[in-house]
Structure formats: structure tokens, C-alpha cells
Amino acid sequence: MGSFSLLHWLVVLVIVLLVFGTKRLANGAKDIGSAIKEFKKSLHEDDKPTDQLGSTSQSTASGPQQDHGKH
């Protein structure tokens, strides 16, 4: 008695479409999708400087390169 059936959800969906319209819902879904894409992109950008920092510290840890051919 407390759960909703599929018919109830379809009625709610139709009412939402009538109130907001398909264009507003499509624009809202597009905005949410682009926000998620930007969020994932920022997560990957945060990882890149850490990797680059680790590779530069390894090259400086080996010390300066000496040229033994010239005296």
C-alpha cells in the first residue's frame, strides 16, 4: 500500500512534462551532463601535476649530468 507502482510513476512523469515542457527538461539535462563532465575533467587535471612533480623530482635526484668527453 505504501509503494508506488509503474503507473504512478508514469502519471508523475506526464505531469512533470506538462508543467515544465520538454525543452526546459532537455536543457536541464544538458546542463547537468556538462557539469558532470567538467567535474570529471577537474579530477583528472588534479592528478596530472602530481605525476609531473614526481617525475621532475626523480630526474633531479639523480644529480647533474657530467660530461666526461671534454677536459
UniProtKB/Swiss-Prot annotation:
GO biological process: protein transport by the Tat complex
Domain of life: Bacteria
Region (Disordered): 43-71
Compositionally biased residues, Polar residues: 52-65
Broad class of the protein's primary localization: membrane
Pfam families: TatA_B_E
Gene Ontology MF terms: protein transmembrane transporter activity
Gene3D superfamilies from the UniProt entry: 1.20.5.3310
Cellular component terms per the entry's GO annotation: TAT protein transport complex
Family, as annotated: Belongs to the TatA/E family.
Protein name as annotated: Sec-independent protein translocase protein TatA
Species this protein is from: Xylella fastidiosa (strain Temecula1 / ATCC 700964)
Classification of source organism: Bacteria, Pseudomonadati, Pseudomonadota, Gammaproteobacteria, Lysobacterales
Gene that this polypeptide is encoded by: tatA
